[in-house]
Amino acid sequence: MYKTKGGFQLTLQTLSLVVGFMAWSIIAPLMPFIKQDVNVTEGQISIILAIPVILGSVLRVPFGYLTNIVGAKWVFFTSFIVLLFPIFFLSQAQTPGMLMASGFFLGVGGAIFSVGVTSVPKYFPKEKVGLANGIYGMGNIGTAVSSFLAPPIAGIIGWQTTVRSYLIIIALFALIMFIFGDTQERKIKVPLMAQMKTLSKNYKLYYLSYWYFITFGAFVAFGIFLPNYLVNHFGIDKVDAGIRSGVFIALATFLRPIGGILGDKFNAVKVLMIDFVVMIIGAIILGISDHIALFTVGCLTISICAGIGNGLIFKLVPSYFLNEAGSANGIVSMMGGLGGFFPPLVITYVANLTGSSHLAFIFLAVFGCIALFTMRHLYQKEYGSLKNG
């Protein structure tokens, strides 16, 4: 695979996604350092952390569409050039407003996810698309890279200099993409409104968006809330909590290609149903766990299923939407990003209301059960009885 043009572009775009996600997630791990120099309230911090997540999700729709129009090379290149400005602005931030403005445009780093999932399938036969998109999705590990490396580096050279060091990485990848990006990528120029009209009538888009809202939403949400949750509810050391959270992120990320491989070899919808059954069991375990050991089992179960599920879903998207792949990828990935924004808020609200977060995890199980019904409906419409395929 890697001896081909497609293999080279897959490698280039995956590394670009790593860098984009590093920039997208830079504020959160550095916030303990930033708030020592910038006077911010807890409420302002929550807004500052949320802004990149929201914009990084919403921008995925136009980015996916633009990829089909001009090609991944120019969307990646332009995104990296744009990212230089908020990164530099962040390194100079002295007020909450400057942090918010920086975070707003850092969302570009998260939005580039839809570029690769739109471009990469063009280079591979249908039976390899799941694996290819799964490998590309491993670029999500950029979030973990910032989480693991940015704090210790900031402890040595300061958070401002740490942020400015990202300028070198981003500029380097802008240059690499300019030189090695594929100018011959196949373009699909279907008018946006025509695509949206077609997509709005296709129930599969709504199902896939809902499923990804759960799987990728769980991936993002657990990465956000786990460190504080482990410290507050189980009294775990902050460093240990960070390591455990990093394991969750890494496990889900590296299992994403496995989901793609399974989707290539077997019926992806059937495998996804099995995946969600196991995820529901994991959510129930979290909903009844009061001990760290049982909670860890539940978290690892969710991580495994989220990673495999992410890969399976992006095996299905290009299969169902050929001419509208860019917009469909953008919409589905947008919903996944938004899925990571709401769960931490729900967990906090439920904990404040009931004194326990158990009910919030049961909500995840309920959402999973609803997803199973939609999967059964799609499978029966597309393939007939579940006994077939």
UniProtKB/Swiss-Prot annotation:
Protein name: Probable nitrate transporter NarT
Transmembrane segment boundaries: 14-34, 45-65, 69-89, 97-117, 139-159, 161-181, 211-231, 246-266, 268-288, 294-314, 331-351, 353-373
Localization per Swiss-Prot or TrEMBL: Cell membrane
Record keywords: Cell membrane, Membrane, Nitrate assimilation, Transmembrane, Transmembrane helix, Transport
PROSITE patterns cross-referenced by the UniProt entry: MFS
Family: Belongs to the major facilitator superfamily. Nitrate/nitrite porter (TC 2.A.1.8) family.
Keyword Membrane carried by entry: yes
Gene Ontology terms: biological process: nitrate assimilation
UniProt keyword annotation of Transmembrane present: yes
Gene: narT
Gene3D superfamilies for this protein: MFS general substrate transporter like domains (1.20.1250.20)
Membrane topology qualifier: Multi-pass membrane protein
Family annotation (InterPro entries): MFS (IPR011701), MFS_dom (IPR020846), MFS_trans_sf (IPR036259), NO3_transporter (IPR044772)
Function: Probably required for nitrate uptake under anoxic conditions. Also possibly involved in excretion of nitrite produced by the dissimilatory reduction of nitrate.
GO CC annotations, alphabetized: plasma membrane
Coiled-coil residue spans: none
GO MF term set: nitrate transmembrane transporter activity
Major localisation: membrane
Induction statement: Positively regulated by the two-component system NreB/NreC.
